[in-house]
Amino acid sequence: MDQMMMGAMSKDMMSMPGMQAMDMSVMQACMDACSACEQACTVCSTQMMSCAPACMNCADMCNTMMRAMMRMQGMNPATMMSMLDACMAMCQMTMDECMEHADHSEVCKMCAQACKACMDACMAMKDMMMAMS
């Protein structure tokens, strides 16, 4: 998504009751990382059959996480924390699988890097949510 649309979306989300305390830059970074990881995993799944199932599952999880963050209003914080944990676990598994091929596959290397960035962003999101509670 382009910056103008994301800025407008963040502004709209900030107007929702209960969202004012949310650090939208952390949330936006997590959504961006999930989107990038979804794309990298989708590309990787078409290139390396040995890691295709992990990559496809990770892409789906990242997409689900990103979409859930877009509609956080009314989301149970414990559920969101569990989803972030699941996303990080899926990214870790996929990163580990892709690292086995990273020395001879640039696609797997990029996928592993995207998974790591997504894990880091999900952890930052969790930290921010815990600080709010």
Where are each of the predicted segments found?
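Amphipathic alpha-helical hairpins
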Residues: M1-S133
